[in-house]
Amino acid sequence: MFGGGSPDTGASEDLSGVQFVNGTRSGNTALVELAKTQAGNVGGYPYWSWYGFNSRVEWCACFVSWCYGQAGLSEPRFAACQSQGVAWFTSHGQWGARGYENIAPGDAIFFDWDLDGSADHVGLVIGTDGSRVYTVEGNSGDACKIKSYALDYACIKGYGLMNWN
């Protein structure tokens, strides 16, 4: 039911020297800066607890929802990637499939690790340099980590497109 973690258990990436490309959609840099400060958190306690769980769950979606909540948003709020997260963005006309070129900082990025058509993991977009997308993800090896992926990476299911206007 819940979103699983990233199979990559490596350390967070160093973003120094990365030049991000600005798209036409505005993002939320304050949300991104908040999410980046969470890198290194292990176990996800503040996120799944904030969501209302009494014990540890797969917490990637709780992390994303917590970040949106800290930005003052009451929704989207989801603990399951496919049945709640993807469903919310799709039903609100705010979904962009893999290859969508106008992602913005603060958008959600959904992954399908086993390529079965169902999202298994979610993170937040920090930005893109035109060839890679940079993310902050909860529950990546049971920790918050900064990661990057080629924009055409097959395991990217799509993006939850936030409307910050």
What is the meaning of each model-derived region?
Residues R25-E33, S83-A87, E101, A154:
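Generic alpha-helical secondary structure signal
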Residues S74-D142:
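...with weaker cross-activation on analogous glycine-rich loops/strands in unrelated enzymes
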